[in-house]
């Protein structure tokens, strides 16, 4: 599934993050899926999703260079497919 960077997203209420030295683990208590956020910057993006009007706004606020947005969009799409993040 592709993600619409112009839409607003948030961490699913059934998902919990656990910080790790290089990123974070995210466990979804509803579907029992475990995801790994591989970079601290991706952790920041996921945290900022709830406070921005779009995923693009969260990427910008996290300081992700525009050239890396496609990579981050793919990561966010995978998190959406796993129901870790939801559109709001």
Regions inferred by a protein language model and the residue ranges of each:
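Long, low-complexity, charged/polar intrinsically disordered regions in eukaryotic proteins
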Residues: 1-32
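Long, charge-rich, low-complexity alpha-helical segments
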Residues: 30-88
């Amino acid at each position: 599934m592709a993600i619409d960077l112009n839409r607003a997203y948030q961490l699913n209420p059934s998902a919990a993050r656990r910080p790790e030295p290089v990123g974070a683990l995210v466990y979804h208590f509803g579907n029992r899926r475990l995801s790994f956020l591989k970079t601290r910057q991706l952790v920041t993006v996921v945290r900022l999703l709830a406070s921005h009007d779009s995923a693009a706004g969260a990427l910008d606020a996290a300081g992700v260079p525009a050239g890396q947005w496609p990579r981050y969009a793919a990561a966010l799409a995978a998190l959406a497919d796993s129901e870790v993040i939801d559109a709001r």
